[in-house]
Amino acid sequence: CNGVFAIRYGLECIDADPMDIGIPHFHNCLDSNNGGIVNSMLKHIKLGFGNTTEFLSYDIRQGRVTREEAIKLVKELDGRCHPRYIEDYCYWIDITVDEFWTVANSFRGNMWELDTDSVWRLKNPIWKQVPFNDNIDIYEVIDRIDSRRVALEKSQHSPR
């Protein structure tokens, strides 16, 4: 993967909790704390899936995760974005957080519905369609596919 290659040659990745950034692959959030993280959340709002779904589909095909593990990670991570990243992004582009949400929600796809608690929920998420083990430890899976660790292992076993 390009991320592993770049890390082997000195790229430093974000140091963040995946629950805050909504992405299990740290090499996706490089240039700043706001652009990539907020973009992934906006993708989720508009299309109903974010970078977690996209990246894990590749990981499934490469045999790095099982479909069941991917479903658990998608359920827990896809679309997550800590409010501080949204606030930083709004400051960066000089709008209010309310303006941000007005625009973001205007692009929300029809796969969403507003529940009785006024929380947006996917109408038919994969974790309600396919049985899976909801007790999977997402941090164990994230650690196993962490591109920083993979890059370190590859650099120890092969010359640059």
Language model features: what each stretch is:
Residues 1-160:
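Nucleotide-activated chemistry modules centered on ATP-dependent adenylation/adenylyltransferase
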